[in-house]
Amino acid sequence: MELNGVRVSRETQGRLQHFAELFQKWAKTINLVAPSTVDDLWRRHIADSAQIFQLHPKPARWVDLGSGGGFPGIITAILLAEQKDGHVDLVESNQKKAAFLRVCLRECEARGAVHAVRIEEAPKIVADCDVISARALAELDMLLDYAAPWVERNENLRLLLHKGRDYEREVHKARGRWEFDLVKHNSVVESDSVILELTRPRRRI
C-alpha cells in the first residue's frame, strides 16, 4: 500500500484500516469531523494527516494539539509504530473524543497517550517534546502561544501545522509578535492547503 506515494508495511496498512473502521463506528454517535467529509475519510483525513509524519519521519516525541478525531495525532502514532522509538501525546479536552482516541491507540497498537485537559494545562503534564502538530485548531499566532512553554524548554522545537488558503494572512499576523523560520510545503492532497514548518520560534521583544 502507498500513502501519498510512500510505501507502508502490511502491518501499518492493517492498523490504518482498523482505525478507519473504528472512526466510522464512533462517527455515528460523536461529531469527529464535518459529516460531509466522512465519506472521503482516506483522502481527506488519513492521507492528509500522514503528510505531517512524512515530513519528519524520525523517532521523536510529538505533541498533537486539539487531536479531535485523531488527525493528525493518531495517524502519526500509527506510522511511528514501525519504529523502535517515538511517542505521541494527544491533547483533547472533550471527554468523548478523548475516549475515542484512547480506544484507537490501544486497538491499533500505536505508541501514545491521551491527555483530556485544556491545551493550556498540557505543558504541566507533558514536559518535553520535539515536534508539535495541529490541524484545523486555531490561527497561527494562537498556536505559537500554546506552544510557548515547550519552546522555552527546547530551542530546537519544530511545529508542523496544516493550514488553508488564508495562511499568508495568519503568518503576517503571527510575525507581529513572533519571529520564526518558515518553510511552506504544498499539500499533496488538497490543492488549496499547505503545511507550515516552523523552527526557531521566539517571541519578539
UniProtKB/Swiss-Prot annotation:
What EC number(s) does this enzyme carry? Answer: 2.1.1.170
Q: What is its main location?
A: cytoplasm
Task: Reply yes or no: does the keyword Coiled coil apply.
Answer: no
Which positions bind S-adenosyl-L-methionine? G66, F71, I119, E120, R135
Entries under PANTHER family matching the protein: S-ADENOSYL-L-METHIONINE-DEPENDENT METHYLTRANSFERASES SUPERFAMILY PROTEIN
Instruction: Identify the species of origin.
Output: Rhizobium rhizogenes (strain K84 / ATCC BAA-868) (Agrobacterium radiobacter)
InterPro entries documented for this protein: rRNA_ssu_MeTfrase_G, SAM-dependent_MTases_sf
What is its EC class? transferase
Reading the lineage from the top rank, the first entry is Bacteria
Keyword Ligase on entry: no
Q: Which controlled-vocabulary keywords does the entry list?
A: Cytoplasm, Methyltransferase, rRNA processing, S-adenosyl-L-methionine, Transferase
Which GO MF term does the entry hold, naming one? rRNA (guanine-N7-)-methyltransferase activity
Q: Which NCBIfam families match?
A: rsmG_gidB
Q: Which residues form the signal peptide?
A: none
State the protein's name: Ribosomal RNA small subunit methyltransferase G
By its UniProt entry, which HAMAP family does this protein fall under? 16SrRNA_methyltr_G
Similarity comment text for this entry: Belongs to the methyltransferase superfamily. RNA methyltransferase RsmG family.
| Chemical reaction(s) catalysed | guanosine(527) in 16S rRNA + S-adenosyl-L-methionine = N(7)-methylguanosine(527) in 16S rRNA + S-adenosyl-L-homocysteine
UniProt gene name: rsmG
Annotated Gene Ontology cellular components are: cytosol
Quote the subcellular location field of this record: Cytoplasm
Q: Name one Pfam family in it.
A: GidB
